[in-house]
């Protein structure tokens, strides 16, 4: 039950995390490679984003295609994690929305900026990850730009690889009601 709640809230965090920055800081060292303002009215841009399908891992075993888990509002993509009281043919106790750019948008260098608002809740696991396009995890590695658990006031940044599983680990303590 605890894992279930954690996953549901993680997906909710993904919703909040996917609201990209409206402005960027100019840098001579890095080139901003993409901007997503989520300025569509009814849905996210399906030429770039895909709803994450349900899987068997802790992070995706409650993913759902149901519209009740997704919303566009004031230039923000809102991903929700909800208790499943309405989808009788779906046995998952919780449903969550999540999106990724897999197979549609590839980054090979540059700077990535993300503005996100995270809601703290029991079972929450909001995350912004960079995953390999072709190699399976963990062989292709993973960069956790941000992960936050439950009511933690810490945003974790981690890199994983095939050789060391966790290469580096840092964290940032967040002020209450902060934006990441």
For each feature predicted by the language model, list its residue ranges.
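Bacterial Sec-dependent N-terminal signal peptides
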Residues: 1-27
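GH16 jelly-roll
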Residues: 23-172
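Single conserved hydrophobic/aromatic residue that forms the stacking wall/gate
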Residues: 171-180
């Amino acid at each position: 039950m605890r894992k279930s709640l954690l996953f549901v809230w993680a997906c909710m965090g993904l919703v909040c995390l996917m609201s990209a920055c409206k402005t960027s800081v100019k840098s001579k060292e890095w080139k901003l490679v993409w901007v997503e303002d989520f300025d569509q009215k009814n849905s996210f841009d399906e030429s770039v984003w895909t709803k994450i399908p349900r899987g068997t891992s802790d992070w995706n075993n409650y993913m759902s295609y149901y519209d009740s888990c997704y919303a566009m509002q004031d230039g923000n993509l809102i991903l929700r994690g909800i208790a499943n009281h309405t989808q009788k043919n779906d046995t998952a106790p919780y449903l969550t929305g999540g999106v990724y750019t897999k197979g549609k948008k590839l980054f090979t260098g540059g700077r990535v900026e993300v503005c996100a608002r995270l809601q703290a809740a029991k079972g929450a696991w909001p995350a912004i990850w960079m995953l390999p396009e072709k190699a399976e995890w963990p062989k292709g590695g993973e960069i956790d730009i941000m992960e936050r658990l439950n009511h933690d006031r810490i945003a974790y940044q981690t890199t994983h690889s095939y050789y060391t599983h966790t290469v580096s680990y840092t964290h940032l303590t967040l002020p209450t009601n902060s934006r990441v």
